[in-house]
Amino acid sequence: MRRIDSCFAELRANGRKALIPFITAGDPSLEATVPVMHALVRAGADVIELGVPFSDPMADGPTIQRSSERALARGAGLAYVLEAVHEFRREDATTPVVLMGYLNPIEIHGTRRFAEAAVAAGVDGVLLVDLPPEEAGETRTIFTEVGLALIALASPTTSEQRLDMLCSTAQGYLYYVSFAGVTGASNLLDTHAASDRLRQLRRRAGAPVVAGFGIKDAASAAAMAVDADGVVVGSALVAALAEVNDVRSARERAEAFLAPLRQALDQG
């Protein structure tokens, strides 16, 4: 959790926006995950969101669903994900890593056992798509005790009552879903409507607010970052990585994809 807080504090002090790429652990291959993570950092990533493959990713569109299926077929379970983070930490002790996934694998593992193992591996935060904030108290308590941030999601359809809860309990950063739907589903991103909501959230939240869903390239990243503390890019990056087979190509594709987004954010 401290790495996330330090990262955003440094970005704020330098007037910069966070660039947060999402990749699925184990895709395009088990061997490529850690090299791609390092490549993303070289290209300007501030935080890395690492997707935990799950058999029923209900909030994800076809691109990430297929990515998750491929990773699971290769054996990329929770143990693999934690080992990948541990390996990443051998060379990178500063870049925050956030796991993004679903509640079921963690409940099977045991919440406290998972939290302790995640921190030991070098994980800084966890975003659980299907954990309602009203039911997150016990999980948040366990995570806080071990130093793990429970990242919350807000969307255009989130009620005011729930927003109050999310803003008051936000840890690490608050992830604002810029439109209602599944990941990668929209070709049209309404930046004006999202910007209004982002400004409201930043006034209310006790943590940085980042925007995701629908960000596909440098232009959409720069537009969304104007009123956010950072942006998340997922499906477009996952789709780009799905086109390559070997580790070297995956590294090169990751850097080539992310570098223009970093440049756009820094120039904006």
UniProtKB/Swiss-Prot annotation:
Catalyzed reactions: (1S,2R)-1-C-(indol-3-yl)glycerol 3-phosphate + L-serine = D-glyceraldehyde 3-phosphate + L-tryptophan + H2O
KW Cell inner membrane (keyword) present: no
Classification via InterPro entries: Aldolase_TIM (IPR013785), RibuloseP-bd_barrel (IPR011060), Trp_synthase_alpha_AS (IPR018204), Trp_synthase_suA (IPR002028)
EC number: 4.2.1.20
SUPFAM superfamilies linked: Ribulose-phoshate binding barrel
GO cellular component: cytosol
Active site (catalytic residues): 49, 60
Keywords: Amino-acid biosynthesis, Aromatic amino acid biosynthesis, Lyase, Tryptophan biosynthesis
Superkingdom of the source species: Bacteria
Keyword hit for Lyase: yes
Molecular functions per Gene Ontology: tryptophan synthase activity
Pfam families noted in UniProt: Trp_syntA
Top-level EC class: lyase
Annotated metabolic or biological route of this protein: Amino-acid biosynthesis; L-tryptophan biosynthesis; L-tryptophan from chorismate: step 5/5
Family stated for the protein in its record: Belongs to the TrpA family.
Function, in words: The alpha subunit is responsible for the aldol cleavage of indoleglycerol phosphate to indole and glyceraldehyde 3-phosphate.
NCBIfam families noted in UniProt: trpA
PANTHER family recorded: TRYPTOPHAN SYNTHASE ALPHA CHAIN, CHLOROPLASTIC, TRYPTOPHAN SYNTHASE, ALPHA CHAIN
Subunit structure of this chain's protein: Tetramer of two alpha and two beta chains.
HAMAP family: Trp_synth_alpha
Protein name, UniProt field: Tryptophan synthase alpha chain
Lineage: Bacteria, Pseudomonadati, Pseudomonadota, Gammaproteobacteria, Lysobacterales
